[in-house]
UniProtKB/Swiss-Prot annotation:
Record's keyword annotation contains Metal-binding: yes
Binding residues annotated for heme b, in chain numbering: 350
EC number: 1.13.11.52
PANTHER family: INDOLEAMINE 2,3-DIOXYGENASE, INDOLEAMINE 2,3-DIOXYGENASE 1
Chain spans, region Disordered: 362-388
Name of the protein in its database record: Indoleamine 2,3-dioxygenase 1
Annotated GO MF terms: amino acid binding; heme binding; indoleamine 2,3-dioxygenase activity; metal ion binding; oxygen binding; tryptophan 2,3-dioxygenase activity
Compartment(s): Cytoplasm, Cytosol
Length: 407
């Protein structure tokens, strides 16, 4: 990160502006739009009616009737993000439909061409990612009201009642709760650069406090998301076509590529904030083919480019961990370890969430039907295509190893 002689407050302002990080909602898109220009009204109408169209067996017919639209009229980042979100929802619904074995391997030209055009403009993949369904998929019911679950809603929905509302909004609120940590980063960098252990200790304590708040909000997932509905309904619509035996070759985007392409579904690994803190604290995950580090690096391609650039800038920042080790200051070590323990605690809780929402339901019969005939190793994969329990254990264990101690 650039570290000239500027105040932490000015440094924070510059970072927020340069890397598209909002003062209030962090990496989330501030004030997402809800409407597209009239030309694109057909997309919005389909995206807003997905559950009903799927239930009536009309979804694919309606998608195939959509006009082939170009994207030139979609000017401005927030307008493009709304269109990308809508097309992402439609794409997932078209591919998975009722969530059974009736899967489409080809995305029709009238959807694939504009979707890929928008994806190229935004620097995002043509699949519903975390940047879409969590970071850009929200609104306040009362615009002047608070940023609380009760005053918020999502813009589009899949089948499964309010399951996706709970899943996406709690994930968003975790992001927002943890976002003050980003504001502390300029102070962290400045403190290391200027050899100021007291300033660094204070900044690290503020990061630890934001992680504690994020975990408390994460616990609300159990209040709003039903495990059976998540596993047997919502999880299917969030699944990608990489590492997925249902689409082993990937998805063909008609009119764009001549061969199928593989993309991962939305994953918490695509969250910029927790990868940012790993980099800031010098936490190194296991490397090698199929490793946690490889997966997390790949997930950066699913982040908005400005957020990817922010992560890259952190990698060239003054090394916090090395500074703490060299100072041998007990208070500084404790503040650093509080941050690491905050990440460990969040990742341990994430493991318990995965056990509740993926592992246990995979061993039970669904609400109104037979248990899936997919093998359990498939059922236990996350929407990003990983063996989610092994991945999270690896990330949690390597985070824990970053704790500092000395005689």
């Amino acid at each position: 990160m650039p570290h000239s002689q500027i105040s932490p407050a000015e440094g924070s302002r510059r970072i927020l502006e340069e890397y598209h990080i909002d003062e209030d909602v962090g990496f989330a898109l501030p004030h997402p739009l809800e409407e597209l220009p009239d030309t694109y009204r057909p997309w919005i109408l389909v995206a807003r009616n997905l559950p009903k169209l799927i239930e009536n067996g009309k979804l694919r017919e309606e998608v195939e009737k959509l006009p082939t639209l170009r994207t030139e009229e979609l000017r401005g980042h927030r307008l493009q993000r709304l269109a990308h979100l809508a097309l992402g929802y439609i794409t997932m619904a078209y591919v998975w439909n009722r969530g059974d074995d009736d899967i489409r391997k080809v995305l029709p030209r009238n959807l694939a061409v504009p979707y890929c055009e928008l994806s190229e403009k935004l620097g995002l993949p043509p699949i519903l990612s975390y940047a879409d369904c969590v970071l850009a998929n929200w609104k306040k019911k009362d615009p002047n009201g608070p940023m609380t679950y009760e005053n918020m809603d999502i813009l589009f929905s899949f089948p499964g009642g309010d399951c996706d509302k709970g899943f996406f909004l709690v994930s968003l609120m975790v992001e927002i709760a943890a976002s003050p940590a980003i504001k502390a980063i300029p102070t962290v960098s400045s403190a290391v650069e200027h050899q100021d252990p007291k300033a660094l200790e204070k900044a690290l304590c503020s990061i630890a406090a934001s992680l504690e708040k994020a975990k408390e909000i994460f616990k609300r997932m159990r209040d709003f998301v039903d495990p059976d509905t998540f596993f047997h309904v919502l999880r299917i619509y969030l699944s990608g076509w990489k590492g997925n035996p249902k689409l082993p070759e990937g998805l063909l985007y008609e009119g764009v590529w001549d061969t199928p392409k593989k993309f991962s579904g939305g994953s918490a690994g695509q969250s910029s904030i927790f990868q940012s803190l790993d980099v800031l604290l010098g936490i190194k995950h296991d490397v090698g083919e199929g490793s946690a580090a490889e997966f997390l690096q790949e997930m950066r391609e699913y982040m908005p480019p400005a957020h990817r650039n922010f992560l890259s800038s952190l990698e060239s920042a003054p090394p916090v961990r090395e500074f703490v080790i060299l100072r041998r200051n007990e208070d500084l070590k404790e503040a650093y370890n509080e941050c690491v323990n905050g990440l460990v605690s969040l990742r341990m809780f994430h493991l318990s969430i995965v056990d509740t929402y993926i592992v246990k339901p995979s061993k039970q019969k669904p609400m109104g039907g037979h248990k899936s005939e997919e093998p359990s190793n498939t059922e236990n994969r996350g929407t990003g295509g990983t063996d989610v329990m092994n991945f999270l254990r690896s990330v949690k264990d390597t985070t824990k190893k970053a704790l500092l101690s000395w005689p």
